[in-house]
């Protein structure tokens, strides 16, 4: 990171979107700065005087990283407030790169899709620490309340080797509200026409008015009590979810030493299935799904900045979590107690004005104790399955930065798994600012992932098909990317255009095969080819003051081998078109936001022939539109907002196959590609004091 100082101005030029959160303010004291604050190429901040403890940089819109070699963008709080944003999963409505889809029509499990591939290939980070692994993955997007988030950083393609070897298609990093920020109390209340209510309260305190020590309390409650069955198939469209979530965060500073720490706990009860009054054949009971979750986590960061010309720093970071889940799918059972521990030691130093070296050690441990029954037979005992993996590793990363015009970054990791042995992770990124208009980025690198298939995909138990799981190896893939950003001046405006292409090639992949046998779901290693081509172009402009417009188009070509046949990945839209408009006129008291998306058609798993000769379902689905709008009115200490989602009213027809007999092997709720519920309206209030 380069700092150029003048009398009343601090100019920060960022080398990467996801950087350690240590910079120097003009007074020379170390300050805590959200990484999103340094996402742009060069940002100028007017400082009121020489004695500065914090640097705060705010923008209302999404910021694309222009300074770093990694292709990424930061979604700031103003962007998150353009929609209801009840949780992390609802934060990407306006983002053309990230899709969030239901994994099945019964449990409400959602997954992120990036570069046309599922969320398990996207590394999830909280404050730059790996989080929400294994059994937390199916419902993790609902574990981060929207009101708690300060920003979200999304990087596509290969990430830095600093954060591990797992990111194959990108990273999503969540930055929470900061204890050291200005003291205030915040509230958020939300209610929807679907019977969902949320309440959030956040407060921070500077201990005894001390600018060197602060704490923060984040609380969240939600309750979705409605038994809504809009399509009349006898099943709830949305699960009943009651969640309690609390987190306590701490910050302290002494000279060149900085500490961040947090502890948190979550309790969630999720109930869904057939609604009362629905009769099953042969007097069978109602089919119900009940999932109880208790989660506990803690994290810490210790950092020290040395007083030398190299601006060297050392940091010790880590987090631990325990995720306990008891799930019943009819008479099937999946209970898991998962424990994870992660630690990282990082040293960074400048080797002159243009060279930077980062080295570090890491240790990750996953332990899963699972009790499983895969059939609807209460007389059968559960089977115990234990998965345990410990992975120590080391990395080195070199960055060459020539006046922010040319940045080259190369990194190498070596890790050793007690299950899969030793493996290497090379990654490289290049950024070249050709002129004031065009910026080119290139990336290439490898990623690995250890599959915990039932933990990560236990929603497949909501299918009546027989589940067959083979011996699974470590997933392994290469990813290559190229992107070009254009900053085109038009009169006194700037048209921003970004075009990018990414190619992901799997050497081994965990394949979930719905195609080979209509009565079976087979989970096995890849036997053949698997790849993803993704092309995206997006453009944004502010034609008049207060009006932001964005248009984007993305095309996905995703193929994998299922049962010896190379096929398009099922339930994956071939393309997506997106248009967003945000208008904040005059004094900024009103804000109007709208997002229109056209999701392209795709393939469903191979159907089978029913007794009457008809197909069990269509093998393809057509494109469908969605429209979201929101209006916000700002007041001195609060804001009122109201809006609607999926106002086009599109609903997937027959999202649950065989709903008339959920205890049979023809029942399947996992073939979901689009919205399950129709239009929804909501209203809420945000307050701060």
Locate each region found by the language model.
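N-terminal periplasmic "start-of-domain" segments of outer-membrane beta-barrel proteins
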Residues: 36-40, 50-83, 111, 152
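Flexible loop and strand-edge segments within Gram-negative outer membrane beta-barrel domains
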Residues: 27-28, 35, 224-245, 253-314, ...
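Membrane-embedded beta-barrel scaffold of Gram-negative outer-membrane proteins
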Residues: 313-327, 433, 441, 473-531
């Amino acid at each position: 990171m380069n700092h150029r100082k003048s009398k009343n101005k601090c100019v920060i030029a960022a080398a990467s979107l996801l950087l350690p959160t240590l910079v120097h303010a003009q007074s020379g004291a170390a300050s805590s700065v959200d990484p999103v604050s340094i996402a742009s190429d060069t940002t100028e901040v007017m400082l009121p005087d020489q004695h500065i403890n914090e640097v705060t940089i705010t923008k209302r819109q999404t910021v694309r990283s222009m300074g770093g070699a990694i292709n990424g963008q930061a979604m700031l709080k103003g962007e998150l407030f353009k929609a209801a944003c009840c949780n992390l999963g609802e934060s990407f409505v306006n983002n053309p790169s990230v899709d969030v889809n239901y994994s099945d029509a019964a449990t409400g499990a959602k997954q992120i899709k990036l570069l046309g591939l599922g969320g398990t290939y996207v590394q999830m980070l909280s404050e730059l620490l790996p989080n929400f692994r294994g059994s937390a993955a199916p419902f993790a997007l609902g574990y981060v309340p929207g009101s708690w988030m300060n920003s979200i950083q999304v990087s596509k393609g290969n990430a830095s080797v600093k954060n591990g070897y797992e990111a194959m298609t990108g990273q999503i990093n969540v930055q929470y509200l900061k204890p050291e920020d200005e003291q205030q109390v915040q509230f958020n209340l939300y209610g929807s026409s679907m019977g969902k209510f949320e309440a959030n309260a956040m407060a921070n305190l500077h201990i005894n008015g001390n600018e060197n020590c602060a704490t923060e309390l984040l609380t969240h409650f939600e309750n979705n009590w409605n038994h809504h069955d809009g399509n009349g198939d006898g099943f709830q469209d949305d699960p009943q979810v009651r969640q309690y979530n609390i987190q306590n965060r701490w910050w302290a500073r002494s000279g060149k030493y900085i500490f961040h720490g947090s502890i948190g706990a979550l309790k969630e009860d999720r109930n869904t299935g057939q609604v009362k009054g629905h009769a099953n054949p042969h007097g069978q009971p109602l089919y119900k799904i009940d999932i109880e979750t208790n989660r506990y986590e803690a994290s810490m960061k210790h950092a020290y900045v040395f007083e030398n010309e190299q601006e060297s720093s050392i940091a010790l970071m880590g987090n631990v979590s325990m995720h306990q889940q008891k799930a019943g799918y009819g008479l099937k059972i999946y209970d898991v107690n998962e424990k994870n521990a992660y630690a990282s030691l990082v040293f960074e130093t400048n080797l002159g004005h243009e060279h930077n070296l980062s080295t570090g050690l890491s240790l990750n441990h996953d332990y899963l104790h699972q009790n499983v029954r895969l059939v609807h037979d209460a007389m059968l005992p559960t089977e115990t399955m234990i998965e345990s993996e410990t992975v120590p590793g080391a990395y080195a990363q070199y960055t060459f930065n020539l006046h922010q015009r040319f940045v080259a970054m190369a990194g190498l990791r070596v890790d050793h798994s007690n299950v899969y042995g030793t493996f290497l992770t090379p990654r490289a990124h290049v950024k070249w600012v050709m002129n004031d208009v065009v910026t080119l980025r290139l990336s290439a690198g490898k990623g690995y992932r250890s599959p915990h298939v039932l933990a990560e995909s236990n929603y497949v138990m909501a299918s009546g098909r027989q589940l067959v799981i083979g011996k699974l190896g470590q997933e392994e893939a290469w990813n290559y990317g190229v992107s070009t950003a254009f900053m085109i001046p038009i009169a006194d405006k700037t048209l921003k255009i970004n075009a990018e292409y990414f190619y992901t090639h799997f050497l081994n992949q965990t394949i979930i095969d719905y195609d080979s046998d209509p009565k079976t779901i087979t989970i096995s290693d890849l036997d053949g080819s698997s790849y993803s081509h993704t092309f995206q172009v997006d453009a944004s402009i502010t034609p008049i003051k207060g009006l932001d417009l964005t248009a984007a188009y993305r095309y996905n070509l995703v193929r994998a081998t299922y049962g010896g046949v190379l096929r398009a990945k099922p339930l994956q839209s071939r393309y997506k078109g997106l248009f967003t408009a945000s208008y904040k006129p005059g004094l900024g008291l009103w804000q109007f936001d709208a997002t229109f998306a056209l999701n392209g058609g795709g393939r469903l798993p191979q159907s089978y022939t029913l007794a009457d000769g008809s197909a069990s379902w269509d093998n393809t689905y057509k494109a469908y539109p969605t429209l979201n709008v929101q209006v916000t009115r700002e007041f001195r200490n609060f804001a009122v907002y109201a809006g609607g989602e999926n106002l086009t009213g599109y609903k997937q027809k027959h999202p649950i196959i065989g709903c008339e007999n959920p205890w049979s092997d023809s029942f399947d709720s996992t073939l979901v590609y689009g919205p399950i519920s129709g239009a929804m309206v909501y209203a809420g209030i945000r307050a701060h004091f």
